[in-house]
């Protein structure tokens, strides 16, 4: 979580971000228990109030207009802080394996021209999520480059090529701001991106989901168990096919 005065926000809420148009966008974070948190949006001057619960967590939703901007979003627990250069448009998650991970700078066709032209797409914004694992949904994420970035030759070079070209085509056709969130991991299985609840509905995965629930929270501890299980499996396979 990123410190904003006494208010803490997840790392995905930063300057230059894009919010989904014509929707109720959820904001959440932490503050002192019982503290009132007010969010004010510059597109309509409206304020939304909520209060932190006993554990300090708060959440509320704000209504967004049709595509436009730039705007500011002010979050205050008594000391206001602004998120600046905020756009409203279309937000897409770019997820997948290594084909989604391939960067624009990884020698895509006409790479030099594409990088040069990227400076002209400043209403495309980029958010790059770092890889991490968790057996349960997280309230925060690790992000690269401090959060959302304005599209430019420098910033897009390290971004997903598939994601960027999709976003550029969307921007050209709809003429609205586009926010692209890269969250991909080469070689991962579809099951790794699926909730435990959804997998438990499939008989084949039911026992496996129950096993995951018994694993320790520490990533390092889970990795040790994985290595031990893998070694045991290899030992069994060696007996079958030495």
What do the predicted segments below correspond to?
Residues 4-242:
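Cell-envelope and extracellular/periplasmic
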